[in-house]
Amino acid sequence: MKNRLIILALGLSPPGTMGGNSKITVEMARCLAGKREVRFILPENKLATLTNNVPPDHGIHIHALPAFTGEDKLNPIAATRWFTPRLRSVLREISAGPDDFLYCCSDFHIDVLPPYTLQKEFGFRWLPSIFLFVPFVFENLSRGYKFPAIKYIIYWLYQRALFALMKHRATGFVVTNRSDFTRFPKRFTGKLFDYYGGVNIEQIPSAPLPKRRDVVFCSRLHPQKGIDAFLDTWKLIVQAISAKDLSNVSNPKLTIIGNGSPSYESYLKDKAQRLGIANTIEWLGYVNNEAKFRIYAESRVFVHPTVFDNNGMVAAEALCTGLPVVMQDLPALRDVYTTGCLKVPFGDRNAFAAAVVSLLTDPAEYAATAPTPDQLTALRAHWKWESRAAEFDRWLDTL
């Protein structure tokens, strides 16, 4: 009998959004529910994020806690006091103990402080996750990420403090890139798992669709994802193609999938107006599952202009749908994406624009870059969620 997996997902994305950590957590539960007993603990106001993304016969034991009525990110002490006794009640109800793994879906305080407080009481094997280490202010400024400096100093200090607590009582850690292993003490050797995410292969259209879209971007709308600078790049792309006067791509269109804070979305749309490219962009907001893969299948090129990342599952989704991907050459992604991509120097908008233009206008370049049928088969086998979950399941058995 395999050890039970308890998933604590108080920091799960709310319905209508889906962060990478939440996607990994939901798919982990879906894929492992048939292999070991899975208990999923989350706030009741986030229940739909789970149930809308797993089949009705998922086999997951769900425990929905009363939601914290305030803003949990702004009230860490109150939120922790709210969730800790409620988590304790569930752990007592299910007789949690030393044979159980307790995995946390985020490194937010609501997913760290309650299990840290309760770990000695119940003795469970704690598996925190850190899916992205916050860059220190010098990296932020030197690399031109344009993240708010003061805000990100606070984020960095906040994460470092919680990381210290995690290291004190954790059995192991889950990260999303092997390059992060160097951040951990040697005593965690063999106790780190790089969960790179996956792709819902079954949601990809089985037959080719007409390519009625030119370029597609999909991500949370946030400065980290590079969408701000890409609007400038998109203007260069539109101008370059217009100058070529090509009949097949005379009026290129950009499809943007994703949402963000209302203020940032307004900023981006206002910028598109100022740049004179608003009529070339379709803003679709949050789209997920089959509808998202249909949009991919209708598109010719996927762009991944993220400025700070260590995984980027949307690029894998696009590649598994057969699209070529243009991305910045980030060190953390060099070993993750080696097929079907054109990589350009970081921050070089002209090079990024030239790569997209070449794929849209040069059939030979497109054919040489897009995944071949054999590569597509290999990509899908590598990235399907079931493969990722099986690797994680085997790792659990070694702890």
What do the PLM-derived regions correspond to, one by one?
Residues 307:
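Aromatic "clamp/platform" in nucleotide-sugar-dependent glycosyltransferases that forms part
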Residues 218, 251-267, 285:
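Glycosyltransferase donor-sugar binding loop
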Residues 208-225, 231-236, 255:
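Conserved donor-binding/catalytic core segment of Leloir-type glycosyltransferases
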Residues 151-205:
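Donor nucleotide-sugar binding/catalytic pocket of nucleotide-sugar-dependent glycosyltransferases
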Residues 1-53:
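N-terminal subdomain of nucleotide-sugar transferases
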Residues 324-327:
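Short hydrophobic beta-strand element within catalytic cores of glycosyltransferases
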Residues 341-350, 358-364:
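Conserved acidic donor-binding segment of nucleotide-sugar-dependent glycosyltransferases
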Residues 263-266, 278-288, 295:
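Active-site donor-binding acidic/aromatic loop of nucleotide-activated sugar
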